[in-house]
Amino acid sequence: MKVGFIGLGIMGKPMSMNLLKAGNELVVFDFNETAVAEVVAAGAKGVKSGAEVAAECDTIITMVPNSPHVRAACLGEGGIAETAKPGTVVIDMSSIDPVESKKIGAELAEKGIELMDAPVSGGEPKAIDGTLSVMVGGKKETFDKYYELLMQMAGSVVYVGELGSGNVAKLANQVIVALNIAAVSEALTLAKKAGTDPELVYQAIRGGLAGSTVLDAKAPMMMDHNFKPGFRIELHIKDLNNALNAAHAISSPAPLTAEMMEIMQFL
């Protein structure tokens, strides 16, 4: 399949590489020319704008930091809408505000362009090995059409509902992950300061109700003092802020999310 890919950052670059490995023809764009050069060296074609991507592809993936970047990539100067043919499908795999996702989708629809939101979870390691979790919102028939393409970057791809639902699921994911990481850190610190071996505590609790993917992924790193970042904290703050905005819009209480965002901002 010929696919456009806009956004070759920490997540987008390995995701695009996996699409190439699966045999797709890729046309890519990013403002970071070094990232573009790396993907081009792997077999993609590099172009100078989103509009140039859309001129060649009727299936386009976007993977950019936040809502304004998605809007710019889709509807801004030099963006997808400038040259996209009616019937073009944009699969936005960024993590953005679900309300804004719906607005962008409505504006694209006026131009005959369909939007799906398909944010991912798993971080850079799972982007590299192609085992991301993808949560998708949009038309079910479009999801069915692109399921196999998405699976080339993922370990699981789940249809959640109408446009915007994918980002609602991602916000729920980010709330749980942030609070879980904080809880693991606090618990292991408690064990160490109490004079108990954190490794033995980890082994004791991981098979019980406290066991989780986050515990198994993060506890060993914490105990090894491996704090190499796999995700920028400002992006997680962005996700929590989007979660709070979404919660406030529907009067859903989110006190733990608010507290967690304050802690992250302090860091």
Question: What is the predicted role of each segment?
Answer:
Residues 26, 46, 114-116, 157, ...:
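Hydrophobic beta-strand scaffold residues
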Residues 52-54, 59-60, 67-132:
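Rossmann-like NAD(P)(H) cofactor-binding subdomain of soluble oxidoreductases
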Residues 8, 96-174, 178:
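Rossmann-fold dinucleotide-binding core
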Residues 163, 167, 211-267:
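Interdomain hinge/lid region at the active-site interface
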Residues 1-63, 88, 93:
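NAD(P)+-binding Rossmann beta1-loop-alpha1 motif at the extreme N-terminus of oxidoreductases
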Residues 129-137, 158, 162-194, 203-217, ...:
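Active-site-proximal catalytic alpha-helix in oxidoreductases
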